[in-house]
Amino acid sequence: MKLISIVVGVLFVVGVAGVFGGASAAGSAPAVGAAAPDFTLNSQENKPVSLHDFKGKWIVLYFYPKDFTSGCTVEAHNFQRDLAQYEQKNAVIVGVSVQDEDSHQKFCTKEGLSFKLLADTAQKVSSQYDSVMTYNDAKFSARHTFLIDPQGKVQKVWLEVKPDKHSEEVLAALTALQGASASK
């Protein structure tokens, strides 16, 4: 009986970790209502871009594992497809991953992406947003998204992202949040 209790306890802990663990154990992702941590990283044009550069706009800050991989390419294509709708809603798309500026530039050129991709090669910003994952001893940005309002506050967080429908989810949330703000 004691063995069964131990097994059940271990399975419970593993199950909870699987549901809530995400990409890292720190649990320090900015919460809804919190100020989004500011940062500066180089873009695919090898120019510094800071979060505060977009003050006054809605920001879709999305972290993704790797340029040129299937899920990341689908997610980027969908954000690009919907970019005009985001722009009509005073929103910008900003992608972050651990690849360097050259990789991002090649990815943007090959895939026809016109929004900013930022190089977080030291994983500092990914860590600030609790969006680092490790796979085979390599570190990547986890697939997380933060919707930040024009005042720099986090309004929505996605820690479970399905790349094929994600842009549509973000657009719907942005529309709902803007509607709620307008009615206040």
Tell what function each PLM region has.
Residues 4-6, 10-38, 182-184:
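N-proximal helix/coil linker or "cap" segments that precede and/or mark the start of modular domains
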Residues 30, 39-58:
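A short beta-strand-turn-helix
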Residues 36-37, 58, 142-144:
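Short loop/turn microsegments at loop-to-beta-strand junctions
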Residues 52-73:
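Short active-site neighborhood of thiol/selenol oxidoreductases, capturing the structured segment around
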Residues 71-113, 121-127:
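Structural microenvironment flanking redox-active thiols in thiol-disulfide oxidoreductases
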Residues 113-115, 132-135, 139-146:
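Structural micro-motif
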Residues 140-184:
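Thiol-/selenol-based redox modules, centered on thioredoxin-like
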